[in-house]
Amino acid sequence: MGLVAITLLLVSFVTNSAGNEGNKEFLTVKVIEASGASLGSFMMIVDENGKEETIDLERLSTKKTTFTNNLVTINNTLNKIGDKGYKLVAQSGGGDQYCIFTTYTFVKQ
């Protein structure tokens, strides 16, 4: 649970810090794919107005279908964001065998 709080704090910090750069409006997507039941797998989206949306993903496993299903959901979501006039400006990720974190930062065009 502490990990979720830290993640939300970081998303909030990135969104607030990035929003102070001139007239740029940022949208941040945090993808968490975890194998443990306590955290779960999900995408959290925070737009330039602070509006939050969460999209559930399948729990991380070694099954190819899980990776495929999650990748399709992530890809469709990123495409929808692009269709709304946002451009991807940064991506980072990390993790271990139990959890994968990926952050996408978009700027509104």
Annotate each language-model stretch with its function.
Residues 10-109:
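Terminus-proximal functional modules
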Residues 1-2, 85:
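Solvent-exposed, well-ordered amphipathic alpha-helical segments
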Residues 2-12:
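Bacterial N-terminal signal peptides
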